[in-house]
Amino acid sequence: MKDIIEVRGLSLTIGKTAILNDVTVSLEAGKIHGLIGRNGSGKTMLMKCICGFIRPTRGVVVVDGKRVGKDVDFPKNMGIIIETPGFIPYYSGYKNLKLLAGLRNKIGKEEIIQAMERTGLDPKLKRHVKKYSLGMRQRLGLAQAIMEDPDILILDEPMNGLDKDGVEDMRRYLID
């Protein structure tokens, strides 16, 4: 299989602090890859560079043959879960996803409902997101990431706040 993500010579400096230094990695399509490192080692910053949220000081990121920051600002075939997903607190989970789907014209009601159900959330639940547990917000973050059926999922601390059943559901979903 081909490489879906290529990072070549990537460095990131913020102020006078070197966050990443000459990182080179290739990730093959169709496989699960992981970043392991100590707190503060730059894992999240590397993911943000891959996603196009942060421009590296040096180096190249290529996602599915397109250079991030040159050919494309944000790879369209990518779903992302950040460590602490942010949602509009006074909207329901469904309404939050509907709002995001409206920004990406090709996502309809069925895709939203399916994504919520696949992550163990009830699309009919009217509760505001501010009343969701941390685990429910993580599930909603996963639903947001998968509602477009992306080719690539970037997951930053996806198990954060999930109970034992939630962790097992997340693992099962990711393996399937």
Regions found by a protein language model. Name each.
Residues 5-7, 20:
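Conserved structural motif at the start of ABC-family nucleotide-binding domains
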Residues 36-38:
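The feature captures the beta-strand-to-loop junction immediately N-terminal to the Walker
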Residues 59-74:
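Conserved ABC transporter NBD signature motif
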Residues 153-157:
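Catalytic Walker B motif of ABC-type/P-loop ATPase nucleotide-binding domains
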Residues 51:
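Helix-to-loop junction immediately C-terminal to a conserved catalytic motif
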